[in-house]
């Protein structure tokens, strides 16, 4: 396919360029002008007529090129904690974790909050548990401390509890739980939505926040990611993204989801939606609002199950939202043009969310396609999968969660409910619309590791879980690239390497599709191009002639 009326700013030649187009074409050349692909060809020299004296030609037959990855569930703003806050992932004991916080306290003015990164898990500690408020007090009593783990667990020290107004008399908030010792004393643990409902940490200065976003973007583009869908963004987070975009410091595309809390009246939550003064699709090619995020249940410790937890016969997890209230708020959202994505991992949560979606669709039969998504859907049997497929509900899956949380899931849910978690092959065989991501910072973020994980179903510490749900590499590649374009409603500008699409592509020295499977998770890109410019180029293969300015809202 050739458009010889326009010269190329960049020409890529290689023997192996995976287009991921429906016909599975392998390309030999791609011509880029500005931020878009203008021509592709199967022969490497077929586009040479588009070369001018200023064209940047990247001619390396040993490289394998793919579309840049689209991580459809990546907490980019949360990832900035890893660059900014206490790196507790280095600790291997509770004492080491406390020591890291103590070191930060020595450099921090008294009274100022100390926060930790959340890309870690207590399974890495010798004690295999979260520390208590009393243990965090050993680090400092002069600073409020919040120790975050992933998006669903946190621990405060005593000063943090005091600063947040949390006492032994404080009731559990909707969708959350306060941890207590046997005598009723608070142990500092905040499960589920408790940290979001009860703790309000002052933000860092805006320049520090923008620098953190910029550093996270560089980390992700170095792994080949060109677009992320950030599933938990507050209005303040949205303003941060806008500031970063306006400053030209987004090196990848972001599709934010504004988070809806389960607290407050239905009328107040509908008023909140109306107050956003935007809706799905607002923005430009670099920063565009995807929709709203609802959270129906928790993580492995709080996912809403039909049957009791292995560790507690009286506990089946909890639903964060009253179903009738979610129905009312969600109906108002979709009627105002908002897409909705809902976190649901337990079978009871998945079924309840599908019940709500079905009621909304029946009451609003003219809604456009692509309005409803379930994030994760850990447990979905044949009946619920069929319902989701019939309603056109998109499912986002993240093998990194099974990889990182396998041991916890086995302990809490048991083997019969761990093996079929995120049954990707079953979903696809039955006709579901799926896309893949990482849910970083809970698990790994590298897309090649996501592909490896979906092919092997391997976990970090408890072996292979559910091998019957594994898929092949080319299918996994599509789930980590072009599937995201469908989810975003942008199939004409993102996705396959084809004329008219954005020039978002990534190069590897080895072929991720054909290399030995054990080598796959260790592969590193040598270049990532986003919007026709080098977002990652450690070997300086890309000439600055083709550089473009970042679009602004």
Which stretches of residues belong to each language-model region?
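Non-cysteine beta-strand/loop elements that form the S-adenosyl-L-methionine
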Residues: 284-304, 391-403
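Divalent metal-binding segments
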Residues: 2-14, 18, 22-274, 290, ...
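Residue-level recognition of conserved beta-strand edge/terminus positions
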Residues: 117, 148, 398, 506-509, ...
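Short, charged low-complexity linker/loop segments at the C-terminal edge of domains
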Residues: 514, 534-545
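His/Asp/Glu-enriched, well-ordered alpha-helical/loop segment
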Residues: 331-341, 345-372, 376-377, 382-514, ...
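Acidic (Asp/Glu)-rich catalytic clusters
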Residues: 244-248, 277-287, 388-392
């Amino acid at each position: 396919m050739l458009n010889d009326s326009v010269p190329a700013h960049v020409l890529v030649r290689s023997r192996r360029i995976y287009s991921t187009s429906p016909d599975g074409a392998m390309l030999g050349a791609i011509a880029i002008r500005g931020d878009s692909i203008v021509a592709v060809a199967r022969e490497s020299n077929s586009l040479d007529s588009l070369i001018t004296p200023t064209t940047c030609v990247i001619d390396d037959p040993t490289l394998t090129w793919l579309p840049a990855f689209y991580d459809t569930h990546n907490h980019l703003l949360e990832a900035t904690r890893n660059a900014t806050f206490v790196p507790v992932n280095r600790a291997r004991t509770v004492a080491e974790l406390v020591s890291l916080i103590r070191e930060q306290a020595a450099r921090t003015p008294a009274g100022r909050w100390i926060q930790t990164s959340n890309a870690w898990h207590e399974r890495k500690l010798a004690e295999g548990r979260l520390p208590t408020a009393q243990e965090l007090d050993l680090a400092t009593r002069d600073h409020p401390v919040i120790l975050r783990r992933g998006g669903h667990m946190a621990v405060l020290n005593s000063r943090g509890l005091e600063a947040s107004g949390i006492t032994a008399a404080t009731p559990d908030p909707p969708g959350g739980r306060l941890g207590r010792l046997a005598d009723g004393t608070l142990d500092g643990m905040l499960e589920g939505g408790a940290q979001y409902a009860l703790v309000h940490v002052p933000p860092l200065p805006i320049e520090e926040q923008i620098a953190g976003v910029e550093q996270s973007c560089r980390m992700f583009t170095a792994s080949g990611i060109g677009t992320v869908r950030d599933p938990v963004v507050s209005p303040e987070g949205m303003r941060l993204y806008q500031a970063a975009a306006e400053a030209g410091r987004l090196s990848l595309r972001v599709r934010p989801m504004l988070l809806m809390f389960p607290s407050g009246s239905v009328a107040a939550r509908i008023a909140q939606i109306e107050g956003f003064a935007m809706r799905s699709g607002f923005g430009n090619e670099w920063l565009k609002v995807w929709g709203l995020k609802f959270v129906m249940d928790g993580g492995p410790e709080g996912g809403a199950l039909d049957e009791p937890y292995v560790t507690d016969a009286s506990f089946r997890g909890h639903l964060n939202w009253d179903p009738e209230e979610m129905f009312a708020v969600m109906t108002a959202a979709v009627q105002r043009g908002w897409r909705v994505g809902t976190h649901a991992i337990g079978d009871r949560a998945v079924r309840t969310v599908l019940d709500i979606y079905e009621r909304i669709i029946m009451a609003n039969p003219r809604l456009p396609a692509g309005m409803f998504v379930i994030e994760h859907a850990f447990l979905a049997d044949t009946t619920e999968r069929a319902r989701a497929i019939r309603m056109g509900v998109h499912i986002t899956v993240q093998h990194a969660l099974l990889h990182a949380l396998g041991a916890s899931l086995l302990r809490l849910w048991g083997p019969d409910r761990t093996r079929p978690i995120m049954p990707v092959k079953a979903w696809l065989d039955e006709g579901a619309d799926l896309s893949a991501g990482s849910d970083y910072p809970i698990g790994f973020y590298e897309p090649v590791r996501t592909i490896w994980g979906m092919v092997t179903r391997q976990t970090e510490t408890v072996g292979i879980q559910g091998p019957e749900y594994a898929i092949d590499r080319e299918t996994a590649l599509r789930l980590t690239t072009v599937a995201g374009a469908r989810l975003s409603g942008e199939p004409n500008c993102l996705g396959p390497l084809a004329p008219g699409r954005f020039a978002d592509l990534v190069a590897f020295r080895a072929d991720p599709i054909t290399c030995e499977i054990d080598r796959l998770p260790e592969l590193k890109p040598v270049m990532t191009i986003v919007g026709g410019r080098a977002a990652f180029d450690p070997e300086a293969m890309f000439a600055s002639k083709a550089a473009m300015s970042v679009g602004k809202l």
